[in-house]
Amino acid sequence: MTKKYWNINLEDMLEARVHLGHSTQNWNPKMAPYISAKRKGIHIINLTRTARFLSEACDLVFYAASKGKKFLIVGTNNAADEAVARASKRARCHYVNKKWLGGMLTNWSTTETRLQKFRDLRMEQKKGGLNNLPKKEATMLKRKLARLQKYLGGIQYMTGLPDIVIIIDQHKEYTALQECRILGIPTISLIDTNCDPNLSDIAIPANDDAMASIRFILNKLVFAICQGYFSDLRKP
């Protein structure tokens, strides 16, 4: 796989606060190789390592996208949810940004059933069918539809398991990560200083609490995905 240049520079990462880890008391010793210093009670992430692994991740998603592979982006913490939705829509990726429902991937048949109910309800609403129901029943179905939209809206067009899963905040999304490991789905994870770097196929050390840091990482990955899909469209 030929390496490409993704314009990942130190100044931009510093400005986005990518280097700021967790407190020195809240860390995983396995992250030691990815930490360059301690400052005012927090660990400072080695941005040279961040750039290296982010570049590797961009290469991977570029070539996967150029072959038409499908991606799922997962990030449900308060700093990530909005950025995940925007980035995913930009690159036409599936996403989960509110809550990971246990078994979403490992019990795919159940997820498919939920998605079909969601599609059916949404179609019924568009046709105006819910307006013809008794008020109590219509209200109940509208609430159900709103809940399905909240938790499944980002995967409503997913017809099978994703080829690659991108995880923002590995610590919070541990259940999603474990499901990917069980199914053998490759993962790219944004890992802060309290994470285990050995759990993902590509682990990108970075601040997972700052919106600017999350946006920086996602923007690079999404740009690479878009470039990959574009190169696929240009093939004769």
Curated annotation (Swiss-Prot):
User: Taxonomic classification, please?
Assistant: Eukaryota, Viridiplantae, Streptophyta, Embryophyta, Tracheophyta
Which PROSITE patterns has this protein been placed in? Answer: RIBOSOMAL_S2_1, RIBOSOMAL_S2_2
Q: What is this protein called?
A: Small ribosomal subunit protein uS2c
Determine if Hydrolase is one of this entry's keywords: no
GO biological process annotations for this chain's record? translation
- Which one of the record's GO molecular function terms can you name? structural constituent of ribosome
Q: Which gene encodes it?
A: rps2
Q: Say which domain of life the source belongs to.
A: Eukaryota
State where the protein is found. Answer: Plastid
**Which species is this UniProt entry from?**
Cuscuta gronovii (Common dodder)
